[in-house]
UniProtKB/Swiss-Prot annotation:
InterPro entries: Ubiquitin-like_Pup (IPR008515)
A Pfam family hit: Pup
Cross-link (Isoglutamyl lysine isopeptide (Gln-Lys) (interchain with K-? in acceptor proteins)): Q68
Residue numbers spanned by region Disordered: 1-37
Post-translational modification: Is modified by deamidation of its C-terminal glutamine to glutamate by the deamidase Dop, a prerequisite to the subsequent pupylation process.
Protein name: Prokaryotic ubiquitin-like protein Pup
Positions of modified residues (Deamidated glutamine): Q68
UniProt superkingdom: Bacteria
Region (ARC ATPase binding): 24-62
GO process annotations (BP): modification-dependent protein catabolic process; proteasomal protein catabolic process; protein pupylation
Comment block on domains: The N-terminal unstructured half of Pup provides a signal required to initiate unfolding and degradation by the proteasome but is not needed for pupylation, while the C-terminal helical half of Pup interacts with ARC to target proteins to the proteasome.
Length: 68
């Protein structure tokens, strides 16, 4: 056991990297806001599409759920 610590002959595998994998740099606040805005715009566009094709069914479904 002591020899394993001194000489490094323990259970370490040869294919293990010595350094951790690189991580992506943190995203800036402006980039995060832009990505969130794009997601919101996509969702609103989808809602508009549903309303254009079948507004009556959308309203009935909304009223049946109690308007919540």
């Amino acid at each position: 056991m002591a020899q394993e610590r001194i000489f490094g002959t323990g259970s370490r595998r040869e294919d293990e990297p010595d350094t951790p994998a690189p991580v992506d740099p943190p995203v800036s606040g402006a980039a995060q806001a832009q990505r969130d805005m794009q997601g919101t715009d996509d969702l609103l566009a989808e809602i508009d599409g549903v309303l254009e094709t079948n507004a009556e069914a959308f309203v009935k479904g909304f009223v049946q759920k109690g308007g919540q």
